[in-house]
Amino acid sequence: MFLRGRSPSGPTDEVAGGKGRCQPDAVEPDATALRQHLRNIVALEKACVYGLLRLDEAERMPDATAYHAACEAQLVVQARLSRVIEQTAALAPTSTAGLLCYCEILRFLVTTHQEGEASQGLSDIAGTYAESVRDLLPRLCAPPAGARAPGHAALRDAYLITLARDARQMLEAVPEEASYAEDEVRLHGMLADIALTIPGTVAGAVALATLIGACLDRRDAFEAMPGFLPLQLNLIDAVQDLLDAAVAGIDGAPVRMPPS
């Protein structure tokens, strides 16, 4: 099956052109490598979309040679995209700049992903991202001694953390073959409730990342579930905001540019 992504325009061009948040002043080795992966992924995704247009045109031609050539070219591009995604999933970020760049990579892949379709590459990258957030974010965003998160954010995230814990427990209790069982429907409902809140604290972001990682480990094709897109976007937004605040200082204004 050919990859059918959304037309790469708007924010995609901004990311590819280097105007996104994935362009910190400091040069970190992991960020340098991830920025190159991001450029490659964007370019190959565009090539896939344009290749599909060529396929549609070739299919209407009386000569089958053009269609077969377009098919072969599309398969080559998709194979290259799969390899780059596989390489990206194997490259976990180790710095603030690297984690911010991984945010942009995952945001691009999630927003070009056809909801309801499974994607092993997306699943692998989402798993690496969730693990990186869980392990790296507390260290990168460690507050000064005595500093506390705003009260409303801590209270809001306390409820999210409880929901995430309950969802993980339900996930472990539901048999994998019970795809349409009552418990599975309840799990989907809990994920939808969790998606209503963007974490505002490190603890909340880590809880959400841990839940996403558990879902990816426990559920085949979790990225095809209805709740995948909002959960991922919420986590990306939360991580970017927390890292921006850490870079700017506890009392500083966020430095991330709003989406165009």
Residue locations for each model-derived region?
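Sequence/structural signature of long amphipathic alpha-helices
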Residues: 1-260
